[in-house]
Amino acid sequence: MPPKSRSTGPKKTQKARRRDKKNVPHGAAHIKSTFNNTIVSITDPAGNVISWASSGHVGFKGSRKSTPFAAQLAAENAARKAQEHGVKKVDVFVKGPGSGRETAIRSLQAAGLEVGTISDVTPQPHNGCRPPKRRRV
């Protein structure tokens, strides 16, 4: 009896997805700045993500992800990708207590996007979950 081959059939080659060029002149930039990372997503008015970047995605690891400089590079990266899709003006929604909030907004402006309104949408608990205990250093 011949040995069974472990082949599961023909190899499936992964096809590169073609990214459609959207033409969206006005969008929204959502900046989520936590104590560990900063995530910048640029969406169309319906909320569909056009481009995104984060401090970790840009190349920072560990505690360097939470720095303002990492947030600046992430925002510039997301803005550059969004401008390829025709985004010129954004409304900014900032969420979270992190250190990269203001830096990310400034770098969106420096990258060439016109910033309309800036809104803080940080969720506030109405006495919900118990917060983490205080650090003892």
Curated annotation (Swiss-Prot):
GO process terms (BP): translation
One Pfam family here: Ribosomal_S11
Bias-annotated ranges (Basic residues): 12-21
Keyword entries, A-Z: Ribonucleoprotein, Ribosomal protein, RNA-binding, rRNA-binding
Superkingdom of origin: Bacteria
GO molecular function: rRNA binding; structural constituent of ribosome
GO cellular component terms attached to this protein's record: ribonucleoprotein complex; ribosome
Protein name: Small ribosomal subunit protein uS11
UniProt xrefs under NCBIfam families: PRK05309.1 (NF003698), uS11_bact (TIGR03632)
Compositional bias of kind Polar residues: 1-11
Family designation: Belongs to the universal ribosomal protein uS11 family.
Organism of provenance: Rhodococcus opacus (strain B4)
Annotated gene: rpsK
Matches recorded under PROSITE patterns: RIBOSOMAL_S11 (PS00054)
Function summary: Located on the platform of the 30S subunit, it bridges several disparate RNA helices of the 16S rRNA. Forms part of the Shine-Dalgarno cleft in the 70S ribosome.
Residue ranges of the region described as Disordered: 1-28, 117-137
InterPro entries tied to this protein: Ribosomal_uS11, Ribosomal_uS11_bac-type, Ribosomal_uS11_CS, Ribosomal_uS11_sf
Subunit architecture: Part of the 30S ribosomal subunit. Interacts with proteins S7 and S18. Binds to IF-3.
Keyword Protein biosynthesis included in the entry's annotation: no
